[in-house]
């Protein structure tokens, strides 16, 4: 049986990390694509030269032509401009929308059967535009946001409670922006919901609120520290988890930006919700009950994404 083919559009910090992780996990052969000549070729060769040490078999190809992604099983899109200090994810809109148009055309021509994972910010608007530009079915095009946001939430909670990250489950809904909705009620430590842990005296509501805010600011915190770029290790790990669930038909329950068709009262928009990811892409969207406050926060997040999509239509009327 031939190996799977994983195409990475964009060979920056996230692209390079994705390529390395895909090799370490032996998910398949990797094509690194970038418009900058030499970068994908150099990174591909460097990672390939690490394979004898780490003991994995994968072929690495660097390319500057979309033809190289032909027949890819998974395409992960990181192309675009990253955030710089003081920039919001939304400031990137105009620049990265043009990139999505080119990427969408490349995927449509060479990898129409692929499962596509978008990482480019502003995430929810970019994955929405990418699906329209590529013409791929919506269940095969998703955005990576919720896995990362939930991972940040889980890490902060594990630090607060001094327990293993593996025993913390966390839930983040909504857009991948400052209005994301980390849900304490559906987040647990060894099955015990966070509100119960507050009652048990493990933490205070005030501390929990601060952790929720830190989760919202997670990306900006790293941008502020790095000064010349944005996060790449955790975003890459998150996208690889999604790709692995698809390639191995694991049917993991993962929060991703998926196209809603009426769930949560939302239509024709990509928003972060819990899904089941298997060999058919998004196989199920899980609609959980939200209380009044959670629903209000979720609706606010959706409104923020809707505003970005409207702005996209203003720039590229063909998206309407």
Swiss-Prot record:
MF term (GO), any: L-malate dehydrogenase (NAD+) activity
Name of the coding gene: mdh
Protein name stated in the entry: Malate dehydrogenase
Organism listed in the record: Brucella anthropi (strain ATCC 49188 / DSM 6882 / CCUG 24695 / JCM 21032 / LMG 3331 / NBRC 15819 / NCTC 12168 / Alc 37) (Ochrobactrum anthropi)
Catalysed reactions, semicolon-separated: (S)-malate + NAD(+) = oxaloacetate + NADH + H(+)
Binding site for NAD(+): 10-15, 34, 96, 119-121
EC number: 1.1.1.37
Listed NCBIfam families: MalateDH_bact, PRK06223.1
Record InterPro entries: L-lactate/malate_DH, Lactate/malate_DH_C, Lactate/malate_DH_N, Lactate_DH/Glyco_Ohase_4_C, Malate_DH_type3, NAD(P)-bd_dom_sf
């Amino acid at each position: 049986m031939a190996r799977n083919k994983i195409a990475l559009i964009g060979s920056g910090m996230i692209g390079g990390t994705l390529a390395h992780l895909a090799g370490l996990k032996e998910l398949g052969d990797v094509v690194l694509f970038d418009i900058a000549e030499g970068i994908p070729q150099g990174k591909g060769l460097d990672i390939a030269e690490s394979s004898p040490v780490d003991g994995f078999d994968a072929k690495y190809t660097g390319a500057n032509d979309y033809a190289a992604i032909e027949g890819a099983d998974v395409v992960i899109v990181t192309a675009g401009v990253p955030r710089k200090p003081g920039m919001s994810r939304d400031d990137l809109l105009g620049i990265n929308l043009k990139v999505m148009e080119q990427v969408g055309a490349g995927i449509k021509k060479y990898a129409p059967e692929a499962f596509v994972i978008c990482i480019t910010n502003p995430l929810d608007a970019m994955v929405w535009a990418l699906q329209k530009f590529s013409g791929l079915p919506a269940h095969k095009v998703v955005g990576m946001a919720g896995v990362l946001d939930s991972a940040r939430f889980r890490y902060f909670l594990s630090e607060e409670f001094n327990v293993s990250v593996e025993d913390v489950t966390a839930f983040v809904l909504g857009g991948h922006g400052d209005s994301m909705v980390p849900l304490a009620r559906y987040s647990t430590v060894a099955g015990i919901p966070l509100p119960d842990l507050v009652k048990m005296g493990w933490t205070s509501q005030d501390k929990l609120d601060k952790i929720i805010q830190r989760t919202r600011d997670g990306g900006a915190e790293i941008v502020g520290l790095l000064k010349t770029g944005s996060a790449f290790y955790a975003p890459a790990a998150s996208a690889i988890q999604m790709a692995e669930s698809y390639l191995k038909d694991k049917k993991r329950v993962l929060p991703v930006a998926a196209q809603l068709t009426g769930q949560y009262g939302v239509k024709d928009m990509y928003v972060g919700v819990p899904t089941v990811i298997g060999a058919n892409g998004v196989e199920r969207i899980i609609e959980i009950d939200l209380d009044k406050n959670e629903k209000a926060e979720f609706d606010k997040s959706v409104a923020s994404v809707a505003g970005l999509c409207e702005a996209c239509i203003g720039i590229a009327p063909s998206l309407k």
